Design a protein with these regions (language model features):
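PLP-dependent enzyme catalytic core of the Aspartate aminotransferase-like
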Residues: 17-21, 26-29, 149-150, 158, ...
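N-terminal glycine-rich, Lys/His-bearing helix-loop that initiates the first secondary-structure elements
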Residues: 26-84
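Conserved PLP-enzyme active-site core in the AAT-like
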Residues: 31, 41-43, 47-50, 109-343
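Glycine-rich beta-alpha junction loops
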Residues: 46-48, 61-67, 237, 254-255, ...
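Conserved N-terminal alpha-helix of the aminotransferase class I/II PLP-enzyme fold
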Residues: 64, 69-121, 143-151
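Conserved C-terminal alpha-helix-loop-beta "cap" of PLP-dependent enzymes
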Residues: 327, 335, 341-342, 346-436, ...
Length: 459
């Protein structure tokens, strides 16, 4: 692994600082770790480069790292010593991003990968193989739905879809081959906040970890605080924030007991033939509670190769530094847009947590802190034709497939992001013919409303 990750997980485990002196981020450490988001995203994982004193995180654009001697190399490959080997598996720039997001989420360690899709796939593949299954919420991003409904099935991993509004549906779909539960915190496009604590508690009793995609709720929800075991991110979205780079992250809480139900989690509790027969829950005990993430790094990432580039990691570090400020504006603008659209005659329905009531509102209030997200959905009265006309009439909004950009974005999911889904699958995920997804940016709210109004007037 890496010296910097060792520092982080040892500190998380309460071990003395003397065990983690040599770090790629330097020894200039603050005596008290920052506890507030706005400080964590600026300081966690890096103070100054030990060689140059650079305050900005250096881009380590290299494939390989020099070994001190033959013994050092052998120890690294045997996990007897932590350090950098090859940038497909670990890189000092990526390491800072990993430490920073792990600290942001209150987790033990993280793994940077090439995209959000890679993060979702690896998070599952780290626990499930052919013949196994996971239980997933139906409320998913279209790309994740396709991954689970088709590609995972081709790999022999069954994904059982259940209604996320009923936590007990996860228990009902579970059998002795169920390895994980999966859901999105603020699912796109329905935007109904997932009952994290309820499903996590069910999973804990059964030895099943809850994997949460927190992409749309970065900075406003901490799933680990509610019992989730693993978080995945598309860093492409709000963490990056400027539409410049593709990337993903897997974050390990370090709190899930993988040994409590060894038959439920065999790939962490039985010898792994791909790594000298290592039993992961035992092999990493001297490092910290990071069996899940170390296995993901040293087997799944090693073999499938979906690594994040150091340059992209640098871009995400830059974005992360302003995440709290941007999310405040995203959320403020999105709520204002949702309230305004609710009174527009061309709009049949508005989808946003601010417009919800009952259980859905209670969950949004419980799990979202500091805002209700930057996404707004609306259903236009004219259906598909109205959706197309509206999209084509926008002037300031960009018509793109991304979300979480500083700029305002719009798309018609039924004919784009969810077009590979059947009509029934589209309905299950919350996409209707007239549904338009808006990713509200950080522009002035008056300019956002003006562009929406002129486009709606043409529908």
């Amino acid at each position: 692994m890496r010296r910097t990750m060792r520092y982080h997980v040892l500190q998380q485990s309460g071990l003395p600082h003397k065990h983690a002196r040599a770090t790629a981020s330097g020894e200039d450490r603050m005596s008290n770790a920052p506890k507030n988001l706005s400080t964590i995203v600026l300081h966690a994982g890096h103070r100054a480069d030990p060689n140059t004193g650079s305050v900005a995180v250096p881009i380590h654009q290299t494939t390989s790292f020099q070994f001190r001697d033959a013994e050092h190399a052998a120890n690294l490959f045997a996990l007897a010593e932590l350090g950098n080997i090859y940038s497909r598996i670990m890189n000092p720039t990526c390491d800072v991003l990993e430490q920073r997001v792990a600290a942001m989420e209150g987790g033990a360690a993280a793994l940077a990968v090439s995209s959000g899709q890679t993060a979702s796939a690896y998070a599952v593949q780290n626990l499930a193989k052919a013949g196994d299954n996971i239980v997933s919420s139906t409320d998913l991003y279209g790309g994740t739905w396709n991954l689970f409904a088709n590609t995972m099935k081709d790999m022999g991993i069954e994904v059982r879809f259940v209604d996320p509004t009923d936590p007990e549906a996860f228990r009902a779909a579970t059998d002795d081959k169920t390895r994980a539960y999966y859901a999105e915190t603020l699912p796109n496009p329905k935007l109904n906040v997932f009952p994290i604590a309820e499903v996590a508690a069910i999973g804990k009793d059964l030895g099943i970890p809850l994997i949460m995609d927190n992409t749309a709720a970065a900075g406003i929800c901490r799933p680990f605080d509610h019992g989730a075991a693993v978080i995945v991110y598309s860093t492409t979205k709000y963490i990056g924030g400027h539409g410049t780079s593709i990337g993903g992250l897997i974050v390990d809480s370090g709190a899930f007991d993988w040994e409590a139900h060894p038959k439920r989690q065999p790939y962490l509790n039985e010898p792994d033939p791909s790594y000298h027969g290592a039993v992961w829950t035992q092999a990493v005990k001297g490092i910290g509670p990071v069996a899940y993430i170390i296995k993901a790094r040293t087997t799944i990432l090693r073999d499938l190769g979906g690594a994040m580039s150091p340059f992209n990691a640098f871009q995400f570090i830059q974005g992360l530094e302003t995440l709290p400020l941007r999310m405040e504006r995203h959320c403020e603008n999105a709520t204002a847009v949702a309230n305004w659209l609710a009174g527009h005659p061309a709009v049949e329905a508005v989808i946003h947590p601010s417009q919800q009531s009952g259980v859905a509102k209670a969950r949004a209030d419980k799990y979202l802190n500091g805002g209700q997200g930057g996404l707004v959905g609306m259903v236009l009265k004219g259906g598909k034709d109205a959706g197309a006309k509206f999209i084509d009439s926008l002037e300031m909004f960009y018509h793109v497939a991304n979300i979480g950009d500083a700029r305002s974005l719009a798309i018609h999911p039924a004919t784009t992001t969810h077009s590979q889904l059947s009509a029934d699958e589209q309905e299950a995920t919350g996409v209707s013919a007239g549904y338009v997804r808006l990713s509200i940016g950080i522009e002035h709210i008056d300019d956002i409303k003006a562009d929406l109004e002129q486009a709606l007037n043409k529908v």
